[in-house]
Swiss-Prot record:
Belongs to the IspD/TarI cytidylyltransferase family. IspD subfamily. Pathway: Isoprenoid biosynthesis; isopentenyl diphosphate biosynthesis via DXP pathway; isopentenyl diphosphate from 1-deoxy-D-xylulose 5-phosphate: step 2/6. This is 2-C-methyl-D-erythritol 4-phosphate cytidylyltransferase. One of its GO terms (molecular function) is 2-C-methyl-D-erythritol 4-phosphate cytidylyltransferase activity. Gene3D superfamilies: Spore Coat Polysaccharide Biosynthesis Protein SpsA, Chain A (3.90.550.10). The keyword Nucleotidyltransferase applies. PANTHER family: 2-C-METHYL-D-ERYTHRITOL 4-PHOSPHATE CYTIDYLYLTRANSFERASE, CHLOROPLASTIC (PTHR32125:SF4). Its EC number is 2.7.7.60. The record marks 159, 217 as: Positions MEP for the nucleophilic attack. It holds the Pfam family IspD. The keyword Transferase applies. The lineage of its organism: Bacteria, Bacillati, Actinomycetota, Actinomycetes, Mycobacteriales.
Length: 244
């Protein structure tokens, strides 16, 4: 039996930096909410067997009505809602607990990366299916990055060694669960800012695959303006063809 690929779409945050009246995941982009776009991309990727949308309990009725209205509960693959926790890491753990499989591939995706190409999603999933325990999509860094203490520069890492990390990040579910349990039990003196950094701490090699400029995160009004400019020009249908 082939391994299932389950996508966790994180949509439980408030996203206050966007300055919208709704939580960020539900903000429309050309009339289509960000979370709807993200779920559609997972379905279109042709590698995902189930989508779990992680929401805040307060948004249960709204989210259920939204996904129903957009026909996502009657999609070709199952789509369901799971309540998240206070922080993103808590929400991811809630999502992992909702998956019965012990050998699945799990993709963890920010709903705010609403224009992520389905082909990139497939690329991440296939790299995990090929035997890698942790896979992240990355793009080169355009700016020079400085390490600072206070207001003083203390180092300039070589730009050629730096990458910006996107989502979805892909994992062997057993390995990711083990890393989460160890992190919760040991409470190390560092904050795992993404799931890959947790796996790094746990000692799991993390493979990088090519990301995509379209997978940018809609966090600020400027990000939203960029996403709107892209979709106002033309819906990015060219990106909806999964890669080989």
């Amino acid at each position: 039996m082939s391994r299932r690929v389950v996508a966790l779409v994180a949509a439980a945050g408030k996203g206050t930096r966007l300055g919208a009246d709704l939580p960020k995941a539900y903000v429309p982009l050309r009339d289509i909410p960000l979370v709807v776009r993200s779920v559609r991309a997972m379905i279109t990727s042709a590698v995902v067997d189930e989508v779990i949308v992680i929401i805040s309990p307060q948004m249960q009725d709204y989210a259920a009505a939204l996904l129903l209205r957009w026909g996502l509960f009657s999609a070709d693959i199952p789509v369901r809602l799971v309540h998240g926790g206070a922080e993103r890491a808590d929400s991811v753990w809630c999502g992992l607990q909702a998956i019965a499989d012990t050998d699945a591939v799990v993709l963890i995706h920010d709903s705010a990366r609403a224009l992520t190409p389905p082909g990139m999603i497939a690329r991440v999933a296939r790299a995990v299916l090929d035997g890698n325990k942790a896979v992240i999509p990355v793009v080169p860094v355009a700016d020079t990055i400085k390490t600072v203490h206070g207001t003083t520069v203390v180092a300039t890492p070589p730009r050629r060694d730096l990458r910006a990390v996107q989502t979805p990040q892909g994992f062997d579910i057993a390995a990711l669960r083990a890393a989460n349990i160890a992190y919760q039990q040991q409470q190390p003196d560092f904050e795992a800012t993404d799931d890959a950094s947790l796996m790094e701490w746990f000692g799991t090699p993390v493979l990088c695959v090519d990301g995509d400029p379209m997978a940018f995160k809609v966090t600020t009004p400027l990000d939203y303006a960029l996403a709107k400019a892209v979709t106002d020009q033309a819906e990015p249908t060219i990106f909806e063809v999964p890669s080989d």
